[in-house]
Curated annotation (Swiss-Prot):
It comes from Mycoplasma pneumoniae (strain ATCC 29342 / M129 / Subtype 1). It is a multi-pass membrane protein. This is Uncharacterized protein MG149.1 homolog. NCBIfam families: MPN163 (NF045742). Its main location: membrane. GO terms for cellular component: plasma membrane. It is found in: Cell membrane. The chain crosses the membrane at residues 36-56, 63-83. Keywords: Cell membrane, Membrane, Transmembrane, Transmembrane helix. It comes from the Bacteria.
Length: 136
């Protein structure tokens, strides 16, 4: 009897640990995408301001160079940040598969469904995990 309780207790601990791990990975992924989008908005606003100043002013060389440099910086920033997101996504999948086998069994999902690239999918899975935590 004590062995069954301990096994059940261990499974419950593993389930809670898995839920927390999966939720933290989803939250980290969500906030990374949000910061990526906000930073892109700031960069595009700066590029737009430089373009307006370039169109209004008579100084052509400096502002043209600044506009081109800003656009090139935005492109390289996007490449770098998207590669970071992909790396984080792959590491998150591995971490969830290692630590959350019981959670994946209970939820009957695959690990790649738990960390989707889609914004709505992240919110849906996060909401589902919060409901499971509340039920516990």
């Amino acid at each position: 009897m004590a062995c069954k309780r301990q096994t059940s207790l261990e499974k419950d601990k593993e389930l809670v640990s898995s839920i927390v791990t999966a939720k933290s990975m989803i939250d980290r992924f969500f906030w990374s995408i949000l910061s990526f989008l906000l930073t892109n908005l700031v960069f595009l606003f700066v590029a737009f301001l430089i373009l307006i100043i370039y169109l209004i002013s008579e100084i052509t060389q400096q502002f043209a160079f600044a506009f081109i440099a800003t656009i090139v910086f935005i492109i390289f920033y996007n490449i770098l940040f998207l590669s970071y997101l992909l790396t984080m996504y792959i590491k998150g999948l591995k971490q969830i598969e290692q630590k959350s086998r019981y959670l994946l069994l209970v939820l009957d999902v695959k690990a790649d469904e738990l960390l989707p690239f889609s914004f709505l999918g992240s919110l849906r899975k996060s909401h589902m995990l919060e409901e499971m935590l509340l039920e516990q």
